[in-house]
From Swiss-Prot:
Phosphorylated on multiple serine and threonine residues during apoptosis. Phosphorylation of C-terminal tyrosines promotes its cytoplasmic localization, impaired its binding to polypyrimidine RNA and led to cell cycle arrest. In resting T-cells is phosphorylated at Thr-679 by GSK3B which is proposed to promote association with THRAP and to prevent binding to PTPRC/CD45 pre-mRNA; T-cell activation leads to reduced phosphorylation at Thr-679. Residues 48-102, 120-163, 175-197 have a biased composition (Pro residues). The modification N6,N6-dimethyllysine is found at K306. Residues 289-361, 363-444 form the RRM domain. This is Splicing factor, proline- and glutamine-rich. The modification Phosphothreonine is found at T360, T679. The coiled coil domain mediates interaction with NONO, and can also mediate formation of long, linear homooligomers (in vitro). The coiled coil domain is required for optimal DNA binding, and optimal transcription activation. PROSITE patterns: RRM. The modification Omega-N-methylarginine is found at R9, R228, R234, R237, R673, R685, R687. GO terms for biological process: activation of innate immune response; alternative mRNA splicing, via spliceosome; chromatin remodeling; chromosome organization; dendritic transport of messenger ribonucleoprotein complex; DNA damage response; double-strand break repair via homologous recombination; innate immune response. Residues 489-588 form a coiled coil.
Length: 699
């Protein structure tokens, strides 16, 4: 470590030479460059005392002399230090220091001064390890005054005010007896100083710069430069010593001052830290944090009462009864209340001894007959319906098993009263098992403070009972006989209690077994009821289904009926239409009877052909037609016998066949025109120029 630090900071002793110029001229500059010089001295400081402990104390008194004695005096003594270096105290750290010495011969001068005192270093090394690092720098200048160092070492402490700055605690021991050895150690300190003094040296270099670190005070009366002096040339040390003294003198007063002020402020403004004294999840300002303060002076004010507890945090509610001399105060946490109780109990106040106790919890309830599966959280959740709860605890035995009892503390009395009344009148169950909880007011006992002798009532009965000290009764005496009777009575009570407890336990077991059987039966009944209910629901569903099916069937029937009715209506319409058409046809046929004979003959077909164009039809007949019908037929002439009609028809047919209508036309035409017995003029179809009245077609 020392070698690495030395290389990184100064690159060897050359760094010191460059800054210090080899002599005293660079001393101040060396001090300005703490990293190289101080690093070496710090690491070597402790080692210096081991091998060359006698040198350190000398530097403080000769700071002025050191300035006068630059490098020339130290070179010769450098050789002796090597002999002192061999001591076993500095084996590890001594090795790194030699390279700096080689680089700069002036550095070993410190040991030169120490050779004379080298005999002292071993003893002194053990006692003042702290001094060597600090004084390691001064020893360089000290070599000239080596003989007087013991005395001057103490003297330099007072003259240089550096001692206070360096550190109040460290200075006195160093100045006492060990200062001379550190001086010797300071001589070798340049090389070995970094070893033992490294830790302090590191602190001290930082200390001098800021202005009075504790590490710098370690040297005591000696100047701070010794740290750096261990590795730096003597001349530089001489200049540094005074500079360090001046630098330390300024800061020392400031350093101790703030510390004392801080202590005073801490003692005055001390207040307990709630975050450290409160458990996780603990509620603040509860009834458990409420203190009873008795024996208060009659003239105490509320402000005084609050100031009494000011250091224990901000108080909650405060109540004082001046007439009876007591009061109540609520603090933030139970821990703060316990601290306040322990500190203020029996505290004198205006000639009275204060009595501080925890106030009884007026809103606390005791809960019994709890199931072993009830926890604190379940208990709090169950009773939180009655009001805000401060604490809910299930009491357990030494193995952590539930005792069936618990405590519930409410934040207010109305909530506790409501819970007590509701649970007493009704049945409050916490678990599946029908096991109701039993709630009672909590019986609060003081098992912490008890009854001290000072609070006992010194009445005549007390004096009488306390006349005889504690003792064991002698056999056969009056005391022994009646004491035995008391013991037998207590034994009988114990037996009866055990018997009652046994009977109660048997009764509880029996009740639990009955409850178990009844519970199973109850479950079976519930299952049966559930089954019946499901069956009923199924039956109802079937009925609903059947009703639905019936409705569907009815709807289908209605639809079918409507369809048939529509079909029938359609058939009826068709029939009506057909009937109407038939009637129309019949009407048309009936009207044909009133038609012109020619039309009827034309419609009749064959009957009309016989008379049409038959010139002989009328002439062949024996009797002319009565009504003048156009044709010869039985329909028009019912009076004509059928034989005649047939004969005439036959004759006409024959004529028609023999003489076509075309050829007989003129003959038949001439005959009837001039002949009376012929067919009337208006009926013969052979007369083409005639047009009958019904010439217009009907269809």
């Amino acid at each position: 470590m020392s070698r690495d630090r030395f290389r990184s900071r100064g690159g060897g002793g050359g760094g010191f030479h460059r800054r210090g110029g080899g002599g005293g001229r660079g001393g101040l500059h060396d001090f300005r460059s703490p990293p190289p010089g101080m690093g070496l001295n710090q690491n070597r400081g402790p080692m210096g005392p081991g091998p060359g402990g006698p040198k350190p104390p000398l530097p403080p008194p000769p700071p002025h002399q050191q300035q006068q004695q630059p490098p020339p005096q130290q070179p010769p003594p450098q050789q002796p230090p090597p002999h002192q270096q061999p001591p076993p105290h500095q084996p590890p750290h001594q090795q790194p220091p030699p390279p700096p010495q080689e680089s700069k011969p002036v550095v070993p001068q410190g040991p030169g001064s120490a050779p004379g005192v080298s005999s002292a270093p071993p003893p002194a090394v053990s006692a003042p390890p702290a001094n060597p690092p600090t004084t390691g720098a001064p020893p360089g200048p000290g070599p000239t005054p080596t003989p007087p160092p013991a005395v001057p070492s103490t003297a330099p402490g007072p003259p240089p005010p550096s001692t206070p700055s360096s550190g109040v605690s460290t200075t006195p021991p160093q100045t006492g007896g060990p200062p001379p050895p550190p001086a010797g150690g300071a001589g070798p300190g340049p090389k070995p100083g970094p070893g033992p003094g490294g830790p302090k040296g590191g602190k001290m270099p930082g200390g001098p710069k800021p202005g009075g670190g504790p590490g710098m005070g370690a040297p005591g009366g000696h100047p701070k430069p010794p740290h750096r002096g261990g590795g730096e040339p003597r001349g530089g040390r001489q200049h540094h010593a005074p500079y360090h003294q001046q630098h330390h003198q300024g800061p020392p007063p400031g350093g101790p001052g703030p510390r004392t002020e801080e202590k005073i402020s801490d003692s005055e403004g001390f207040k307990a830290n709630l975050s450290l004294l409160r458990r996780p999840g603990e509620k603040t300002y509860t009834q458990r944090c409420r203190l009873f303060v008795g024996n208060l002076p009659a003239d105490i004010t509320e402000d005084e009462f609050k100031r009494l507890f000011a250091k224990y945090g901000e108080p909650g509610e405060v109540f004082i009864n001046k007439g009876k001399g007591f009061g109540f105060i609520k603090l933030e946490s139970r821990a703060l209340a316990e601290i306040a109780k322990a500190e203020l109990d029996d505290t004198p106040m205006r000639g009275r001894q204060l009595r501080v106790r925890f106030a009884t919890h007026a809103a606390a309830l005791s809960v019994r007959n709890l199931s072993p599966y009830v926890s604190n959280e379940l208990l709090e959740e169950a009773f939180s319906q009655f009001g805000p709860i401060e604490r809910a605890v299930v009491i357990v035995d030494d193995r952590g098993r539930s005792t069936g009892k618990g405590i519930v503390e409410f934040a207010s009395k109305p909530a506790a009263r409501k819970a007590f009344e509701r649970c007493s009148e009704g049945v409050f169950l916490l678990t599946t098992t029908p096991r109701p909880v039993i709630v009672e007011p909590l019986e609060q006992l003081d098992d912490e403070d008890g009854l001290p002798e000072k609070l006992a009532q010194k009445n005549p009965m007390y004096q009488k009972e306390r006349e005889t000290p504690p003792r064991f009764a002698q056999h056969g005496t009056f005391e022994y006989e009646y004491s035995q009777r008391w013991k037998s009575l207590d034994e009988m009570e114990k037996q009866q209690r055990e018997q009652v407890e046994k009977n109660m336990k048997d009764a509880k077991d029996k009740l639990e077994s009955e409850m178990e059987d009844a519970y199973h039966e109850h479950q079976a009944n519930l299952l049966r009821q559930d089954l019946m209910r499901r069956q009923e629901e199924l039956r109802r569903m079937e009925e609903l289904h059947s009703q639905e099916m019936q409705k569907r069937k009815e709807m289908q029937l209605r639809q079918e009926e409507e369809r048939r009715r529509r079909e029938e209506e359609m058939m009826i319409r068709q029939r009506e239409m057909e009937e109407q058409m038939r009637r129309q046809r019949e009407e048309s046929y009936s009207r044909m009877g009133y038609m012109d004979p020619r039309e009827r003959d034309m419609r009749m077909g064959g009957g009309g052909t016989m008379n049409m164009g038959d010139p002989y039809g009328s002439g062949g007949q024996k009797f002319p037609p009565l009504g003048g019908g156009g044709g010869i037929g039985y329909e028009a002439n019912p009076g004509v016998p059928p034989a005649t009609m047939s004969g005439s028809m036959m004759g006409s047919d024959m004529r028609t066949e023999r003489f076509g209508q075309g050829g007989a036309g003129p003959v038949g035409g001439q005959g009837p025109r001039g002949m009376g017995p012929g067919t009337p003029a208006g009926y013969g179809r052979g007369r083409e120029e005639y047009e009958g009245p019904n010439k217009k077609p009907r269809f």
